[in-house]
């Protein structure tokens, strides 16, 4: 992931903005490049006092540049970045996989190695484990469900078993 990452990682307010970036990956020997926009997201991990690298929202372009890429058909995806180090990121990935065994109404995650390269610095890229999460709309569609934006549901308003399954993993 390449761009003015210093500006991105400093933009941690409630109203963080999208910044231009470029995502590179290798498909065999071929280097694939996708221009995109990224911004910080989250709550606890978004704070600089808690995490050096805040979680990111990846906003992919809706264009032919996405055709025949690993991210074809994607719009926005959440990227969990290393907060407490690689071990915690790998453990979080395993928790997602465990939750997937309990319920299909859970997010699919993909563990990956991610390198951060700030285009304004001449430092070597740093590589960490990251976790890419499926889009909310994809999870809802996969489960023939609808998304609701309401915040503050009471446990008594929800399916008891599903709520308790979720609570174990929250």
Residue map of PLM features:
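Phosphate/dinucleotide-binding and metal-coordinating scaffold of catalytic cores
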Residues: 1-170
């Amino acid at each position: 992931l390449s761009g003015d990452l210093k500006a991105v990682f400093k933009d941690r307010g409630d109203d963080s903005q999208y910044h231009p970036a470029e995502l590179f990956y290798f498909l065999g020997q071929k280097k694939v490049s996708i221009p995109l926009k990224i911004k910080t997201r989250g709550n606890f991990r978004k704070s600089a006092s808690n995490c050096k690298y805040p979680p990111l929202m990846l906003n992919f372009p809706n264009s032919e540049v996405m055709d025949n890429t690993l991210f074809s058909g994607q719009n926005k995806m959440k990227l969990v970045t290393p907060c407490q180090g690689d071990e915690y990121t790998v453990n979080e990935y395993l928790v997602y996989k465990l939750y997937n065994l309990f319920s299909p109404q859970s997010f699919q995650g993909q563990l990956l190695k991610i390198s951060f390269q700030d285009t304004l610095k001449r430092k070597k890229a740093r590589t960490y484990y990251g976790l890419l999460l499926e889009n909310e709309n994809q999870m809802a569609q996969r489960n023939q469900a609808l998304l609701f934006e309401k915040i503050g549901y009471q446990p008594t308003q929800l399916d008891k078993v599903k709520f308790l399954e979720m609570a174990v993993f929250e």
